[in-house]
Amino acid sequence: MMTEAERASKLAEPAANDTPTRGKGVFYVHTLGCQMNVHDSERIAGVLEADGYVPATEEQYLNHDIDLIVMNTCAVRENAAERMYGTIGLWAELKRERPNLQIAVGGCMAQLDREKIAKKAPWVDAVFGTKNIGSLPQLLDQARIEGHAQVKVQEELNYFPSQLPTDRASKVSSWVAISVGCNNTCTFCIVPTTRGKEHDRRPGDILAEIRQCVDEGAKEVTLLGQNVNSFGYGIGDRFAFSKLLRACGEIDGLERVRFTSPHPAAFTDDVIAAMAETPNVMHQLHFPLQSGSDRILRAMRRSYRSAKFLDILRKIREAMPDAQISTDIIVGFPGETEEDFQETLRVVEEARFASAFTFIYSPRPGTPAAEMEQVPHDVVQDRFERLVALQERITEENLKTFEGRDVEVMVTGASGKKDAATHRVTGREKTGVLVHVGVPEGEPMPQVGDFVTATVTHAGRHNLIADPNPEAGQTYAVRH
């Protein structure tokens, strides 16, 4: 399955009638990392198109018929940096074949390594940060004129990226940033360094963008922030996020609202109530645990403990019994003992997460945890495999509970490997579970953005299959 970042890597739809114009140049955006990076790549594409560039078609990309490649980088994990330099190295050969090709590097690694990137990869033409996406066209022009790399990375946020033009990867499902940056000081995390302190957008601006998305065809929005539920704290309104969720419920045509990611320390009862009482806010939650050990949580500077975390989950499930909750867990944080790890396994077993993004701890230079005593790799690997096995079992057991139930799926495409051959469409049901829906014989294929209600006939390891047989009393219905 593709990651959100891979789906965001920008390719244009092929022209229907004639050869597409090259404009100022044909570009491709290669995205690494989180949902915020995915959204930033939409801004990068929008800025370039506003300056006269044209997104590459798949054929142009495969034939290397490209004038500009932009890499939007991630800095959260060590292998992200390795992937960045490895990929840029491959592009050096492409540039030797096409001397006029320009290469730009942006995102979190650019914010961190700015000068190092230009020195280590002198074939790069422009380096820009997370706070000055809008300057990319000017940097490319200067590099073309001056014949050497242009490096411009700002430390201060002068404007919200949301003010920039946007070329959204999906016309029916949109990302909407409500804040940028983070005020927490987790000892393992580099994000406050790359994204800066938290800055919130005005609620009116957020709602105006959501309405614009709906007017342009979006049926679903995901509210983005490093810590969405601390939205409004800077102006002393700790209820601002729950108010925003309720305001989303008043927008005509907006079918589904999701958000990511909240911080457990700031997850309050008013947010739970808003989720439960606002019909178009989905009962899906990504809720990062990081560790089940209170000792490790303290070392991480995570300002909650496992008992509080589990108590919040209890309240969520009391208010929304159908809620699907995913999480992040770090294995092998410095100083983690077997006893600490057993606490994590205990919490995971009790929490019954729908899914978990599990990571082996990766030291990031400049973070306090990188200076702590590290756990031997073989020990960490063993723990990681045990955690994955536990979560895989829980995920399968959870998905089995969907068998025989009717789910409403918003069609996003035919992204499953076998969808075309099996006459299926793909999308997510209300709580975020991926579903492949079989279209009964004689029925027209639903289109992207349609809502299909179907009976789940089989639970896979990570998704659901709905191959309903209406003659046997199973449900299949399409809503446009």
Swiss-Prot record:
Which GO cellular component terms, listed alphabetically, does the Swiss-Prot or TrEMBL entry include? Answer: cytosol
Asked whether the UniProt record includes GTP-binding among its keywords, one would answer no
Q: Which reaction does it catalyse?
A: N(6)-dimethylallyladenosine(37) in tRNA + (sulfur carrier)-SH + AH2 + 2 S-adenosyl-L-methionine = 2-methylsulfanyl-N(6)-dimethylallyladenosine(37) in tRNA + (sulfur carrier)-H + 5'-deoxyadenosine + L-methionine + A + S-adenosyl-L-homocysteine + 2 H(+)
Domain Radical SAM core positions: 168-397
Record-listed [4Fe-4S] cluster 2 binding positions:
C182, C186, C189
The entry marks the following residues as binding [4Fe-4S] cluster 1, namely C34, C74, C108
Entry keyword set: 4Fe-4S, Cytoplasm, Iron, Iron-sulfur, Metal-binding, S-adenosyl-L-methionine, Transferase, tRNA processing
E.C. designation(s):
2.8.4.3
Which coenzyme or cofactor does it need? [4Fe-4S] cluster
Its annotated compartments are: Cytoplasm
Annotated CDD domains: Radical_SAM
**Top EC group:** transferase
Q: How is the cofactor bound?
A: Binds 2 [4Fe-4S] clusters. One cluster is coordinated with 3 cysteines and an exchangeable S-adenosyl-L-methionine.
Domain (TRAM) ranges: 400-470
Regarding protein family, the annotation reads: Belongs to the methylthiotransferase family. MiaB subfamily.
Assembly and binders: Monomer.
State the name under which the record lists this protein. tRNA-2-methylthio-N(6)-dimethylallyladenosine synthase
Q: Which gene encodes it?
A: miaB
